[in-house]
Amino acid sequence: MTERADEEGVRRKLRLIRLLHQTNPYPQGLGTARQRRNRRRRWERRWKQILALADRIYTFPDPPADPPLDQTIQQLQGLTIQTLPDPPTTQRLAETQGSLPAVWVRVDPRSVPGPREGYKRDSYERGEELVGGSGTNRKGDTRSSTKDQAGSRNCPPVRDRDISKETL
């Protein structure tokens, strides 16, 4: 009967603490910056008061003590490390063995591309020149001076007589 009364007392205390927390909602974001800041400060002061009051209403019991160090050491001593088999010495031996331990299975990294097949990440591999490159492309063709870098529209050539002091 005392356990049930203790449980009911704990529940009553926790309900009271929950009610206290519900009576202090976080402030809404209306008003000027100063008004919002002051509301947050007042809310934080009330929140600290509620925490102090809740701590007086119900103090949580201490957690159970850690197991003694001797017991922990004994548990660690009971652990064993399995010895790993030697890795295969040749590639053929590795292929003929049907069941290799997962430790020695060869894994190829995904980021290593093959000899320029299917991997077109760099401008060199795409055959494009970087900005300010030479006047020829990889095929040896010279670029047209009337095309912009995108090569999609024609631009008229600029002559010295078109530029005057007024335009500068």
Swiss-Prot record:
The lineage of its organism: Viruses, Riboviria, Pararnavirae, Artverviricota, Revtraviricetes. The gene is rev. Residues 16-24 are annotated as: Homomultimerization. InterPro entries: REV_protein. This is Protein Rev. Keywords: AIDS, Host cytoplasm, Host nucleus, mRNA transport, RNA-binding, Transport. One of its GO terms (cellular component) is host cell cytoplasm. Transmembrane segments: none annotated. A motif (Nuclear export signal and binding to XPO1) lies at residues 71-82. A motif (Nuclear localization signal and RNA-binding (RRE)) lies at residues 35-49. GO terms for biological process: mRNA transport. It comes from the Viruses. Escorts unspliced or incompletely spliced viral pre-mRNAs (late transcripts) out of the nucleus of infected cells. These pre-mRNAs carry a recognition sequence called Rev responsive element (RRE) located in the env gene, that is not present in fully spliced viral mRNAs (early transcripts). This function is essential since most viral proteins are translated from unspliced or partially spliced pre-mRNAs which cannot exit the nucleus by the pathway used by fully processed cellular mRNAs.
